[in-house]
Amino acid sequence: MRRWARCSALAVLAVPMLAGSTLAQQRLVLVDQDGSGPAGSNQMAMLALLNAPHVQVLGITMVSGNAWEPEEVQHTLRMLELTHHTDVPVVPGAIYPLVRDEAESRLQQSIYGTHPWYGAWGDLAQGTSRQPYHAPLVVPPLQEGSPTTQPLAEDAAHFLIRQVHAHPHQVTVYAAGPLTNIALALRLDPEFASLSQGLVVMGGSVLPQTTDPEFANNPRHEFNFWFDPEAAHIVLHAPWPRVDLTTVDISIKTQFTRDMLTQIASAHTPSAEYLAAYTGEFYYLWDELAAVAWLDPKIITREQLLYVDVDLTRGPGYGDTLTWTATSKPATGVQLVHVQQDLDTAAFYREFITLMQGR
C-alpha cells in the first residue's frame, strides 16, 4: 500500500534482532507488490524481506496500484541495483485491474464523493497520488536513475505458478498491492493456492480506531481491495493453507519517523544509503508490518479469526471489506482469515530498523 508523507516526533532505538528469532531456517517467499518509488513503503517492505537472514526471495512480481506497473518495474529494478540484490528477478504483471477501470471510478467519484487516495489514477497536485498523473505505459524519468538490468521475460501469473510448483508447500505468497496477479494465477492454476505454504496480504479494513478522516469516515475502505475488488474476491475464496491479513486497523498503529530514518542511515550499508537518499515518506508502515509480521509472528499480540470478502455491488461500498464470524458467514465459500488486531510496537520498530539497515 502507499503512501503519503506525514511527520511524527516518535523516537525508537534500533537494536539487533534476538538470536532466538523465528528466522531459524531458510524460508521461501514470493513478493507481489505495487512497487512505486523510489524508497517509500513499498520498497521498504521489499527490503525487509530481501535483507532478512534465512529468507530467500524467489522473485518480485509487479502489479499496478500506487503507480502503473511499467513504472514500478523500473523503480524496483533500480532499487535492487542500488541495494545489491540484483540476483532477485523482477517480473512484469498486471497493468489494469480485472474489471474496475478509471472511467467507472471517476463516475463513482462524481456520485459518491472523493477518496483520499487513487494511486495510479491519482495526481500529485490533488494529493491523491505520489506522482503526477500520467498514462499507464509512460515511465517518467526516475529520480534515482534508470536501471541497467532487465525484468524477466515472463508474466507474473505464470512465474508465480511455476515457483509454487517447483517448491510445493514451501512458498509463502506475500501480496502487498492489489491482488490482480494472484487472482490471475488462481484462475490459470486451480492448485496454486493449495500448493503454497500460505498467503500474507496487506489489505482490508474492519473497524480502525482513529480520528484520521480517511478511515474514520470510511472504516471499511482500503486501497488495495478497492483498486481491484474482483481480484480480492477471487483470492479470498481460494483454498490457501493459511491467510494472514494486515489491515488498516493494525497498520495505523505504526508510524515511520525521521528519527527512524536517521538510525537507519547511520548503518552506511547499500540499503541504508538508498533509503537515506530517497525516502521522504513518513506515514503508516502498512506493507512493512505485513512483511515483518511474517518474519516474526511474535510481534502480533492479538488477532481475530474472521471470514473475509469484498463488496462487489456497484455502489458507494464497491471494494469495501466484508467480514463475518463462524455463526454469521454466508454459504458462498468464504475462507477463514487470521486478521491481525494489535502488535508489540517496540519489538516491531526494533526489527524493522535492523532490517532496513540491512547489508
PLM segments and residue spans:
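Sec/Tat signal peptide C-region and signal peptidase I cleavage site
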Residues: G20-A24
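Active-site histidine-anchored catalytic micro-motif
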Residues: Q25-T86, D101, T128-L245, S251
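Short, surface-exposed amphipathic charged segments that create phosphate/polyanion-binding patches used
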Residues: E104-G113, P213-N217, M260
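A charged helix-plus-loop insertion that forms the helical arch/lid used to bind
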Residues: L107-Q126
